Each structure stands twice: as C-alpha cells, then as structure tokens.
C-alpha cells in the first residue's frame, strides 16, 4: 500500500511523466511509497468534440472550464482515493505554499489535485468540492500542472524512505525555517578558491555550528522575513551576531 495516493485531474496528464519517470519521485513510485493517477476531464465529455470549456458569462477574454466534466472526473478520483481524500485546487488565488503546509499535506493518506487551464474553472465547482486552494507564487502560469508537480515533489520528499539519506529531508532549506547553508565537494581548491577549513576538520560539532551560522546569515541577508516568524535560541542569536560582525569587518 502506498504511503500517499495522489489523484490528479488535468487536461494534460502526459505532463506528469516528469513525476513518475524521473528523479526522487520516480523512485518513490517504484518503491510503492507514492501512487500517482491522472484523470482527464475530456474522457468524461459526451459531445463529439470532447468540449471541456466554454465562454465566461458576463463576457471577457478566454474560456472557463465546465463543471460537468470536472465533476465526473472527480467522482472517479474519489472512488480511487477514498471519500476522505483532500481536494486541492492549484490556483493563484490560493494561499502560498510553504514548507509548513507541505509537512501537513505529507501526513494525508490521499490528495486529489485539480489542475485548471484557460481562465480557470467554474466557481461553482470550487464552492462545492474544493477543500483548499494553494498557489506556488505571485506570477502567472498557463495551467495548474506545474504547480501540482511542485506540490507532489515537495510532499514526496517527506515520505519516509523516499530520499537516499535519512537526514536529507530534515536538512533541506526551510525545514527549520532557515535557508540552507553552502555546500562543497571535491576538489578542495578550484580557481584559487578553497573549501572552508572547518569542513575539512572532521570536527562534527564545529561543522554543525558553522552550517547553522551560515544558514542564519543567509536567511538574514536574503529572506529576513523568515526570521520574523521564528524564535531564535540563545545560541542562534550569538551565531548570527558573530556572522554579521565578521561580515561587516571583512
């Protein structure tokens, strides 16, 4: 049995081969940790043109996805996922997805993701069936498929056994509310730039301290808003003060 079932309702199910055939998400599918199924609303139309959209009432540009094909696809997705599955619409009107939300979604047994197209979907479908709306940022995309894939990838990383190293998910950026620290690999010197000595020292306590300090400093410089919602420990405050002092002195 999969740790997580994800049912996707999309006019372009082929796009989700990026999830099922590549990288960490592909491995999770092969290991049975993630079960991914796509449902195309076109398969639930009755006219010869397989019409899934129509002009918006009130006029305006573009087309709107019709209710009935979406509802019929949702019935099949619910039958597969179970009645308790959370229905999520990927939408620029939704709350912005963050790591805290991803952690909550990773605790679900099943998710049904609605990937809209055109100018969006009929609001009556949202009112009747959607539990949550999520956005991946304040910019415009051509459809909900890419946001759905972002959500699936982020959630899959948190499934037990999905990553190659047990600590990888816990050490990712944002997991503890901070940006990630710098990473280095061989060679030790490249174009006269050396790997920081502390990473070659073998002293795990010093390495942990350095990485935490770098994460704090990067977050302060690049995403200070993240620190506003995070309570720093005494050690973290001291490390950040040292980082800023060394930066200003250099």
UniProtKB/Swiss-Prot annotation:
Quaternary structure and partners: Homodimer.
Catalytic activity, reaction form: guanosine(37) in tRNA + S-adenosyl-L-methionine = N(1)-methylguanosine(37) in tRNA + S-adenosyl-L-homocysteine + H(+)
Lineage: Bacteria, Pseudomonadati, Pseudomonadota, Gammaproteobacteria, Pseudomonadales
Compartment(s): Cytoplasm
Function in brief: Specifically methylates guanosine-37 in various tRNAs.
InterPro entries recorded: Alpha/beta_knot_MTases, tRNA_m1G_MeTrfase_C_sf, tRNA_m1G_MeTrfase_TrmD, tRNA_m1G_MTases_N, tRNA_MeTrfase_TRMD/TRM10
Disulfide bond entries: none
Signal peptide start and end residues: none
Gene assigned in the entry: trmD
EC nos: 2.1.1.228
Keywords: Cytoplasm, Methyltransferase, S-adenosyl-L-methionine, Transferase, tRNA processing
Name of a matching Pfam family: tRNA_m1G_MT
Residue numbers binding S-adenosyl-L-methionine: 116, 136-141
Family, per entry: Belongs to the RNA methyltransferase TrmD family.
Protein name (record): tRNA (guanine-N(1)-)-methyltransferase
Superkingdom in the source lineage: Bacteria
GO molecular function, one term: tRNA (guanine(37)-N1)-methyltransferase activity
NCBIfam families, per database record: PRK00026.1 (NF000648), trmD (TIGR00088)
GO terms of biological process kind: tRNA N1-guanine methylation
GO cellular component terms, A-Z: cytosol
